[in-house]
Amino acid sequence: NPPEFIPQPFDSVDLAVALDAFKGGIDLPVVLTCRPDRQGGYFSGTEEQRIGVLRAAIESGVSWVDLEIDIKAATRKELMSMAEGKTRVIASTHSTDEPSNASEIVLDIEGMEASGEIIKVCYNTSGRNSGLKLFEAAWNLKDSQLKTSIMGMGAGGDWTRIHGPLLHQDLVYSTMESGSHLSSQGRINAS
């Protein structure tokens, strides 16, 4: 049986100790993401607490940190400065909307170019149509100098993940879960 999960108040967690323990158990590069509710994440604390998690992650020397492009400009600039030379930055946005068209996706990504080393965009997808828009955008960018990760959540969202090598995607997220339900959620597993 797995250990029982017992929720604790946020302020009772020593972030430095927790991050060191987390990193110590993983030999591969660590990507720290602390996604807010507004972008489909599960961090339920305040924005100030979330930024504190990102700061602590950078201070701990994680390999990568995921910084949403909608973080307040002054705060994002401070985090980018802290990360410089020790932690690489993924600039991300997670839209609750479906992708409008491939050209707009490409323009959005090009507009984010200076925001991080890898540009990650994620859209809600509902099938073939939206999956093809993401695929087309990734195809159009595959030979550019931009490092990208383009994906969807929902049916059709897994196409760019599955074809990551063909599309020259620089980062593909997968799960350790298995099951036929993953495809309808736009996810792939690691095996």
Give residue ranges: language-model regions.
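Catalytic alpha/beta core domains of metabolic enzymes, predominantly
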Residues: 70-191
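Active-site beta->alpha loop and helix N-cap motifs at the rims of alpha/beta catalytic domains
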Residues: 2-84, 88-101
